[in-house]
Amino acid sequence: GHYHLATVDNQRISKEFTRNMRTGIERTYEKAVENPFLHGIPYIWCSNNLTTAMLTQCRLYRETTGDETYAEMEAALRDWLFGCNPWGTSMIVELPLYGDYPSQPHSSLLNAGVGNTTGGLVDGPVYRSIFESLRGVNMTGIPGTPGQDYERFQPDLMVYHDAIHDYSTNEPTMDGTACLTYYLS
């Protein structure tokens, strides 16, 4: 809504909602500059959904104002989803083909052996404290294939796993996938 209100003819309304967009982006940017991946998103459930939301917000702000201040963060957020992250893996199921991507998402399709959620954006990393408090999560992979725990690459602060039984970091989400589709279209 802020994007549309920022483009109305009424200058008072337009300025107010442009300021609202910039303020939200700036708060994320202030955290991002402390991260080597320029990623200032909190690592809560569905952190990749938040990443795509901020990615889209940066683009809409840039298109509305012509202000390139946050273009580098926008690129870093996009790149995070495609593998420029501590694990070096894409967060999109089966993309890039023959690359490192979520191959064992928490999905009933995969569990039943009838296919995969190709193109789905997975939840993304969560704070280690969240992951360690969960029940029923394990690194068991699909039969015959162990899950990928990325143990060598796990930062102290957060975790991500490519294992079918990790519903906290590796479950594809429709809303995150839709947001990413919007950005990429």
Predicted regions and their residues:
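Aromatic (Trp/Tyr) and acidic
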Residues: 1-33, 41-185
